[in-house]
């Protein structure tokens, strides 16, 4: 039986959180396990629209990110994921504070994965909900390609035998 390698997860978190887009938005994936991810973001002025509330694109990016990483642990090591569809329901505006995003796998198939993500504030108020459909792409947009693009040497294997 294959189990996730905790050393791989630790290295992936370090890698992705240093990525250019995550840095641009100042978001962090802080938890990653089979079927689940957790992303946090402390709202800054750069996240706000001209009216002083959160820009809808920030909600979309957070939901897309949390959904992607919620199914990452379910795909083979040499496969990547590409978002096919993203549906976002903006349920409440927010102007400040920490956003907590929980991604949960709905289904991980051979070709298509579906996950949802919920965005909360610190008081557990639901701010946004979204669903992402992702295509499994063997050999395309793999974690090893991210390793190369960011100048890292390598990662520990994704799975270990039990």
Predicted regions and their residues:
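Terminal targeting signals and extreme-terminal segments of soluble enzymes
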Residues: 1-162
């Amino acid at each position: 039986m294959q189990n996730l390698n905790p050393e791989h997860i630790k290295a992936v978190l370090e890698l992705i959180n240093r990525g250019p887009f995550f840095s641009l938005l100042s978001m962090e994936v802080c938890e990653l396990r089979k079927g689940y991810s957790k992303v946090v973001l402390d709202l800054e002025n750069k996240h706000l629209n001209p009216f002083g509330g959160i820009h809808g694109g920030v909600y979309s990016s957070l939901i897309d990110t949390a959904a992607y990483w919620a199914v990452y642990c379910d795909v083979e090591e040499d496969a990547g994921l590409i978002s096919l569809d993203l549906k976002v329901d903006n349920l409440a505006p927010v102007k400040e504070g920490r956003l907590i995003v929980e991604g949960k796998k709905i289904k991980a198939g051979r070709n298509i994965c579906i996950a949802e993500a919920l965005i909360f504030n610190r008081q557990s108020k639901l701010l946004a909900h979204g669903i992402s459909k992702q295509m499994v792409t063997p050999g395309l947009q793999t974690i090893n390609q991210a390793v190369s693009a960011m100048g890292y040497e390598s990662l520990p294997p994704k799975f270990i035998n039990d």
